[in-house]
Curated annotation (Swiss-Prot):
Protein name: GMP reductase
Keywords attached to this entry: Metal-binding, NADP, Oxidoreductase, Potassium
GO BP: purine nucleotide metabolic process
Annotated binding of K(+), by residue: G181, G183
Role, per record: Catalyzes the irreversible NADPH-dependent deamination of GMP to IMP. It functions in the conversion of nucleobase, nucleoside and nucleotide derivatives of G to A nucleotides, and in maintaining the intracellular balance of A and G nucleotides.
Residues the record lists as binding NADP(+): 108-131, 216-239
Family annotation (CDD domains): IMPDH
Protein EC: 1.7.1.7
Family: Belongs to the IMPDH/GMPR family. GuaC type 1 subfamily.
Top EC group: oxidoreductase
Active site residues per record: C186 (thioimidate intermediate)
Amino acid sequence: MRIEEDLKLGFKDVLIRPKRSTLKSRSDVELERQFTFKHSGQTWSGVPIIAANMDTVGTFAMATALASFDILTAVHKHYSVEEWNAFAASASADVLKHVMVSTGTSDTDFEKTKQILIANPALNFLCIDVANGYSEHFVQFVSKAREAWPDKTIIAGNVVTGEMCEELILAGADIVKVGIGPGSVCTTRVKTGVGYPQLSAVIECADAAHGLGGQIISDGGCTMPGDVAKAFGGGADFVMLGGMLAGHEESGGTVVEENGEKFMLFYGMSSESAMNRHVGGVAQYRAAEGKTVKLPLRGPVENTARDVMGGLRSACTYVGASRLKELTKRTTFIRVQEQENRIFNSL
């Protein structure tokens, strides 16, 4: 046993210090980025925000809606091969280039993914997603996937430390997904005591990944557009959003009505709700590590997408970054004890 004395920070612990700027308008800020990925050699350009691979967020409808903003969607892994084929046949090439196929690490997952990618060669992203990316089996699966699909851009996660980020990139991942426990409907930290404050995880993993020519996704912990800006400021190449994109028309959650008001169910992928739906319940040897919440219906996701992108542009103008790529170079974080004046928050 040992204790690390270094302070670790989340998004709520900091603000971004403003700096002199020559930008005249938020409209001068370019949010689009271009990446060429280490192993696949693929090039992608767009706004590096990703809808999370949760079945109440990462739907085909969400992918179609967000593609118009050049935003990516990691489509959840519970669609069948037939559903994938039908979607790919009806979607435009522009939509498909903003879509990630998600998979677990079982033999069944591998065979299903193989069928999807063979039938739909226009799909270029593969997101290999498990709650705990520290297992030897997971690293072996990433290597197996890289060998099977050398020209696909592979995302692997989740981890929160530099050495594991490096191991996954060396095993064949182009992009590493960073975050254990920060999600709005994740209870891993309270059920297990395991986790890492998200901003510090992003800073550490970005340094490790960039040293090897890889990229990272900050996954979880964002509750508002300012948090998205902080994640990019900390060095994230992409930011994945779950709760911020839940509850919309495209989110796919079950709609319930209470006292004349409609709500949409949103749950973590390790919650009892998710396991009841997909694997027949919570196994006796494990605990649920997620919760279910009811969100007021929020309308089309385009309004939220515009809000997030507008907040990002504004953050860039405050520090003089004319492009999103420059934000991390222009970011100085200051530690704080308050984020906002909350006097009217209850009204």
